[in-house]
């Protein structure tokens, strides 16, 4: 699993580096986090968490600063979080998290993306019960046992720690992700490849041929929607 995360991060970072839509999505997320609390990330842990993720995706500093400055202003623009669940070809499943200023527009767009690209929308809970909500942290290292002990000493609810090919992957209870990050930073870890709340599939499916092509198109259309923040799937490699 550790190598999987590293591979996904490498692929995502390469794509994000040239993708202005990703920058815009992080801009919205940073704005919302700053608007809900203090616009200073040192006193707003939710904002700091989003900024750290943005930096991992190589979002330029001026995009981050612009979103924070917007939150400091008098704008009354509001955004609503949403979650949609659905099915793709041959046992594939997707969970789509959105952040939008127009819920009706977003719902229609997500439904159309599924319907026009070989998928179909499901009811709330039709997919998510087959996924586990976890905090995921990935960083360079070798000694998984030492990291596990360190997190236990910091009273972190840690599910598992894996080491593979120089990369350590930590899985925590979602409520303890921030605590785990703080504990690891205090131990001297300065750079993280991943710090995310994830919906992890309990089992994965492998697609090939036309099924894979159909799924890739569906995933791409959803990913390109400006209101879609994250997509979780049970398809291997995504």
UniProtKB/Swiss-Prot annotation:
SUPFAM superfamilies: YebC-like (SSF75625)
Subcellular location: Cytoplasm
A Pfam family reported for this protein in Swiss-Prot or TrEMBL: Transcrip_reg
Keywords on record: Cytoplasm, DNA-binding, Transcription, Transcription regulation
GO biological process: regulation of DNA-templated transcription
InterPro entries (alphabetical): Integrase-like_N, TACO1_YebC-like_2nd/3rd_dom, TACO1_YebC_N, Transcrip_reg_TACO1-like, Transcrip_reg_TACO1-like_dom3, Transcrip_reg_TACO1_YeeN, YebC-like
The keyword Transferase is annotated on this UniProt entry: no
Gene Ontology MF annotations: DNA binding
UniProt GO cellular component terms: cytosol
Record bears the keyword Cytoplasm: yes
Bilayer-spanning residue ranges: none
Protein family: Belongs to the TACO1 family. YeeN subfamily.
NCBIfam families: PRK00110.1, PRK12378.1, YebC/PmpR family DNA-binding transcriptional regulator
Name of the protein described by the UniProt record: Probable transcriptional regulatory protein SP_1922
Originating organism: Streptococcus pneumoniae serotype 4 (strain ATCC BAA-334 / TIGR4)
């Amino acid at each position: 699993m550790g190598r999987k995360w590293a591979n996904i991060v490498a692929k995502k970072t390469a794509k994000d580096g040239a993708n202005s839509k990703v920058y815009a999505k992080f801009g919205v997320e940073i704005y919302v986090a700053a608007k809900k609390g203090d616009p200073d990330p040192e006193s707003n842990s939710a904002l700091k968490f989003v900024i750290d993720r943005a930096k991992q995706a190589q979002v330029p500093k001026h995009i981050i600063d612009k979103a924070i400055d917007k939150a400091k202003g008098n704008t009354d623009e509001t955004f609503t979080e949403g979650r949609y669940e659905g099915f793709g070809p041959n046992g594939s499943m997707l969970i789509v998290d959105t952040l939008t200023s127009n819920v009706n527009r977003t719902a229609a767009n997500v439904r159309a993306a599924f319907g026009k690209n070989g998928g179909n929308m499901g009811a709330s809970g039709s997919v998510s019960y087959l996924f586990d909500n976890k905090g995921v942290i990935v960083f360079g290292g070798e000694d998984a046992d030492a990291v596990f002990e360190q997190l236990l000493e910091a009273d972190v609810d840690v599910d598992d720690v894996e080491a593979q090919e120089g990369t350590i992957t930590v899985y925590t209870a979602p409520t303890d992700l921030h605590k785990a990050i703080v504990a690891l930073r205090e131990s001297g870890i300065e750079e993280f490849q991943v710090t995310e709340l994830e919906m992890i599939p309990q089992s994965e499916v492998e697609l090939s041929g036309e099924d894979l092509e159909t799924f890739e198109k569906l995933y791409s259309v959803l990913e390109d929607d400006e209101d879609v923040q994250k997509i979780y799937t049970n398809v291997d490699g995504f």
